[in-house]
């Protein structure tokens, strides 16, 4: 799409009369879970054929950063990257069709440092998580995301989330959240979020 003008105001090789139509250069999948699918088939035909041109990854969990344990997949094949940036570059290297962007997942940071234990992060773990969040921002993350309705993300305290959000805020990063509750604790979840 080069220009949007009233009919007959522009001479061009191709002119499309979009009167009474919605015009978009492409749709954005803001909650994309296609990372693994893109590793298998980068063409992303299902979304591309629906007009999706940008896949936003990383809701809660992300391609990185990964520690040695996290890199070993269930199929025993090691993931060939460590950082979020390397994971995104891996997808680009496969020649994926859509544009991709990613949040760094707060769950990924927590598992990297705390594992799956239901306990508060120590001060040292929080500082390392903040450093990993900053590194992900420097590698191109658009912000940090949480999925607080799922374990082990729900083990994180509000203070932990605030500390991580402050780290990405240093880079003008965004914060998005799948809140802790969508039911009986909805108001409390909204209070925590806002």
Locate the predicted segments by residue.
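Short low-complexity, flexible loop/linker segments enriched in glycine and/or proline
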Residues: 16, 69-73, 160-161, 190-192
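Histidine/acidic residue-rich metal-binding segments in metalloenzymes
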Residues: 86, 120-146, 152-194
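Divalent-metal coordination cores built from histidine and acidic residues
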Residues: 21, 28, 32, 38-143
């Amino acid at each position: 799409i080069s220009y949007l003008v009233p009919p007959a105001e522009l001479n061009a090789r191709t002119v499309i009369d979009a009167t009474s139509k919605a015009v978009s250069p492409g749709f954005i999948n803001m909650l994309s879970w296609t990372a693994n699918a893109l590793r298998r088939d980068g063409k992303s035909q299902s979304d591309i054929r629906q007009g999706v041109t940008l896949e936003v990854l990383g809701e809660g969990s992300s391609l990185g950063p990964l520690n040695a344990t996290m890199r070993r997949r269930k199929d025993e094949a090691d993931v060939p990257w460590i950082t979020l940036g390397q994971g995104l570059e891996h997808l680009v290297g496969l020649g994926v069709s859509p544009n991709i962007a990613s949040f760094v997942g707060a769950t990924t940071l927590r598992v990297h440092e705390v594992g799956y234990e239901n306990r508060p992060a120590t001060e040292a773990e929080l500082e390392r998580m903040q450093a990993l969040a900053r590194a992900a921002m420097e590698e191109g993350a658009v912000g940090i995301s949480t999925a607080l309705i799922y374990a082990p993300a729900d083990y994180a305290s509000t203070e932990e989330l605030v500390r991580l959000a402050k780290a990405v805020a240093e880079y003008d990063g965004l914060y998005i959240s799948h809140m802790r509750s969508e039911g009986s604790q909805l108001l409390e979840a909204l209070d925590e979020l806002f």
